[in-house]
């Protein structure tokens, strides 16, 4: 799920890399998807070519001591495009003398790019995620994002859907390239044993649909619970395992308790990162029927959980939101549904749970696709090429 475990002793790309200063508000040990995205990228680059500038956070000293590259911590727990952050960044660029400055999230920290390049001569690049796409609907934020595009040489996007919207906001002022999230394919794989998780929650050998994510409305756990009576009508032994914490937990619990199939819906609560692979492996099908909310302001830019599930060998039911459909090859590795419609969600999940041999075949196809397109090694190889082009 967002902020999931990284592979230990990650293999690094050994070709000559561009030296990079990563400036980011989002970095471990703080949890989160952007944090893990940045971490998984930099830890696979040659350590002598990377320096990270990130906020202070509880446990940062211990975390930093275990990393092979240098991490410089800002005095506070948040980094915004203030004069102080810009000044400290300029000083660090002058000390480190990187080939390129890269922002872990282009907005809003990318607003200091102009000053950095003007005062140091070092070009800048930035990663984009969901927020940069979402702000395209807000006039002031859209203008600021266009300014960032004019001050950097490269913006990356995690999906083709996101890239199209970033390109629209960039207005041709910089290159926009695809750089999806990767998956630690050695951590999430079909050989992981989910038996202990099944035993813990009394799932036995029943067919299980698992959903791993934060419990927030956009992710669609509510539609899964609403759909579950229809699923059980077709597959009487079917169980739903909802994994993760979040502010929607109480409401979801009330929904499940009032359902006629309440005994077939299970919540795990928050799970340690190292146990997430086993929770995926406890399922036969993965579903997260995400949906876009708030007039496009709340959406799924890609959805790394879909890739983690596929890496584990599960067929995926994804919601039609943002770039999420790009994680599925329709009919081959899973299916895409309208996450607003419980009936459509129920039909897709029940069809897979009712035919587990077909579900396993789709899961195997998903695993092969992850290995070919979404391994961190493949993603970092692409990143190195993009950084080299941006630094010239």
Model-found features: residue ranges?
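Carbohydrate-associated surface elements
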Residues: 161, 182
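Acidic donor-binding loop of glycosyltransferase active sites
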Residues: 270, 281-299, 314
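Short hydrophobic beta-strand element within catalytic cores of glycosyltransferases
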Residues: 306, 311, 315-318, 328
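Conserved donor-binding/catalytic core segment of Leloir-type glycosyltransferases
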Residues: 21, 156, 203-219, 225-229
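Nucleotide-activated donor-binding/catalytic signature segment of Leloir-type glycosyltransferases, i.e.
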Residues: 250-277, 285
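Conserved acidic donor-binding segment of nucleotide-sugar-dependent glycosyltransferases
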Residues: 327-342, 351-357
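A short, well-ordered alpha-helix in the C-terminal region of glycosyltransferases
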Residues: 237, 351, 358-372
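A short helix/loop element that forms part of the nucleotide-sugar donor recognition site in Leloir-type
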Residues: 189-203
